[in-house]
Curated annotation (Swiss-Prot):
GO terms for biological process: 'de novo' CTP biosynthetic process; pyrimidine nucleobase biosynthetic process. It catalyses: UTP + L-glutamine + ATP + H2O = CTP + L-glutamate + ADP + phosphate + 2 H(+); L-glutamine + H2O = L-glutamate + NH4(+); UTP + NH4(+) + ATP = CTP + ADP + phosphate + 2 H(+). Its EC number is 6.3.4.2. SUPFAM superfamilies: Class I glutamine amidotransferase-like, P-loop containing nucleoside triphosphate hydrolases. It comes from the Archaea. ATP binds at G13, L14, G15, K16, G17, T18, D70. Belongs to the CTP synthase family. The keyword Manganese does not apply. It comes from Thermoplasma acidophilum (strain ATCC 25905 / DSM 1728 / JCM 9062 / NBRC 15155 / AMRC-C165). Residues 294-527 form the Glutamine amidotransferase type-1 domain. The active site is at C374, H500, E502. This is CTP synthase. Residues 1-264 are annotated as: Amidoligase domain. Catalyzes the ATP-dependent amination of UTP to CTP with either L-glutamine or ammonia as the source of nitrogen. Regulates intracellular CTP levels through interactions with the four ribonucleotide triphosphates.
Length: 545
């Protein structure tokens, strides 16, 4: 068992998560079993109640864990499934230690940061290593070196290396380029490594973020002041797509350095060759409008972005995302006029819902390919009730408790639930698909397992009415009680799901409903242009299998 710890310095947002994921991908593609841990120094127990504007998307795992979006990157890059235990927060650590103290586990001792907090951190890391059976566990430490919140975690990791000797430290820093000559400045990296060394950690690898590739002179200067060999200075310059990063790091000599540090024979097979080629040189493009309320922060919908990137890598059809604020759509649907497809993602709260309903109506009435996810599924049901069934004012009780037509209502088991954190219908659930439906053709299966995150469902009292109006609920939960997929028979371009298919999308196995949406968008685009490309998307689909 070996550990690779990835820390960050100078500023946040340098891409530690993507670099950690890329290291994991390289090792996984070399036949090495990997797992990953994200350390988040915030006091929240998990990411479940966080505002997407502050923290980005809340990623949902198979076991129902609501975690940092970096775990989504780990799963996608390494093609592994993680659990809530792979996300360690200050809140989890302190709560466990306090509960042990209340239980009397410390036998009256004074409970302190060292050793009790640090011991709990190490215990959690070792438990992930044990249960995963991984050869290498990657550990990303959130924040930057010097942050007061991360100090106990860095101390625990220093102790981990002292106790086990099988820990590699990698540090991500910024090398800014200043002035008319764009001179690469190493001083921020020098000071960042100095801060790390002051707490007893000497990095073995430095990932230097910059706009342009580091010069050999810059690498030598960083090496001189940090005691990291030149071959351990890895230049990480900007790339057009994050899935091109692993090959860049390989070209920089990362495998040679890791092989020496881990004492492993690393033979990278690069399973993404054709995938990367499709990303670099797409053969066609479509515009997909994502209509949401957090569109100013694209990371709030990062799994949708990545799912579309996966479609591009498998089909060569690039997706240009139009980020549309749902509040603007309510009174002006013209903002959707250039879209080849519309996606309504998940969300909570009343703000922007009427705009999402308007966007759904626009798609239905203009034949624009449509995909609704979670709240988007519920919004589709509301739109059908209002504009097809004529139930004026139909709504979800989430937004209007006194609506005359509550076509979407709270789950029975959610009634009376007071706590917000970790109490929704969460995680992987069995979905049973009806034969002879669009959903069955898309998935090619009778049963699938998808991840959920919701408190509300289609009101059973309105199911027959909606189906008699020309729509069909083509999938349900295992008991046949909860509706999971809505489609319109005879219309290949309209589908909505209660589950979050984006959370299970992988580079070589893209979300099937996102893939279908892009196929339909391509047909719509060329039909609108007056061209006959009926067979084009089918060919693209076969390439994506």
């Amino acid at each position: 068992m070996q550990y690779i710890v990835v820390t960050g310095g100078v500023i946040s947002g340098l891409g530690k998560g993507t670099i950690t994921s890329s290291i994991g991908h390289i090792l996984k593609d070399s036949g090495i079993k990997v797992s990953a841990v994200k350390i988040d120094p915030y006091i929240n127990y998990d990411a479940g109640t966080m505002n997407p504007y502050q923290h980005g998307e809340v990623f949902v795992l198979d076991d129902g864990g609501e975690v940092d979006l970096d775990l989504g990157n780990y799963e996608r890059f390494m093609n592994i499934n993680l659990s809530r235990d792979n996300n360690i927060t200050t809140g989890k650590v302190y709560l466990e230690v306090i509960q042990k103290e209340r239980h009397g586990d410390y036998l009256g001792k004074t409970v302190q940061i060292i050793p009790h907090i640090t011991d709990e951190i190490k215990r959690r890391i070792r438990e992930v290593a044990r249960t995963s059976g991984a050869d290498v566990v990657l550990i990303e430490v959130g924040g930057t070196v010097g942050d007061i919140e991360s100090m106990p975690f860095l101390e625990a990791l220093r102790q981990l290396k002292r106790e086990e000797q099988n820990v590699v430290f990698a540090h991500v820093t910024l090398v800014p380029e200043i002035g008319p000559t764009m001179e690469q400045k190493t001083k921020p990296t020098q000071h960042s490594v100095k801060a790390l060394r002051e707490i007893g950690i000497q990095p073995d690898i430095i990932f230097a973020r910059s706009k342009q590739k580091l010069t050999e002179e810059t690498k030598s200067r960083i090496s001189l002041f940090t005691d990291v060999p030149v071959e351990g200075i890895i230049s990480v310059s900007d790339v057009e797509n994050v899935y091109l990063l692993p090959q860049m790091m390989v070209n920089e000599g990362l495998i040679t350095r890791l092989s020496k540090l881990l004492n492993m024979n690393i033979e990278y097979r690069d399973s993404w060759t054709s995938y990367a080629e499709n990303i670099r040189h797409p053969r066609d493009r479509v515009k997909v409008a994502i209509v949401g309320k957090y569109v100013d922060l694209h990371d709030a919908y990062i799994s949708h972005k990545e799912a579309f990137s996966h479609v591009t890598g498998n089909t060569g059809i690039a997706v240009d995302i139009m980020w549309i604020d749902s509040e603007k759509v309510k009174n002006d649907q013209s903002v959707l006029s250039e879209a080849d497809a519309i996606l309504i993602p998940g969300g909570f709260g009343y703000r922007g819902v009427e705009g999402k309903i308007a966007a759904t109506r626009y798609a239905m009435e203009n034949g624009v390919p449509f995909l609704g996810i979670c709240l988007g599924f519920q919004v589709a049901v509301i739109a059908v009730a209002r504009y097809v069934l004529g139930l004026d004012g139909a709504n979800s009780t989430e937004f209007d408790e006194k609506t005359k037509y509550p076509v979407v209502d709270i789950l029975p088991e959610q009634r009376g639930v007071k706590d917000m954190g970790g109490t929704m219908r969460l995680g992987s659930k069995k979905v049973v698909i009806k034969k002879g439906t669009l959903a069955h053709r898309i998935y090619g299966a009778d049963v699938i397992y998808e991840r959920h995150r919701h408190r509300y469902e289609v009101n059973p009292d309105y199911i027959d009415m909606i189906e008699k109006a020309g729509f069909k609920f083509s999938a349900t939960d295992e008991e046949g009680i909860r509706m999971e997929i809505l489609e319109r028979p005879g219309d290949e371009s309209f589908i909505a799901t209660q589950y979050h298919s984006e959370f299970k999308s992988r580079p070589l196995d893209p979300s099937k409903v996102h893939l279908h949406l892009v196929e339909q968008a391509l047909i719509f685009k060329h039909r609108r242009m007056g061209e006959n490309h009926e067979g084009y998307a089918t060919a693209a689909s076969s390439q994506g299998q």
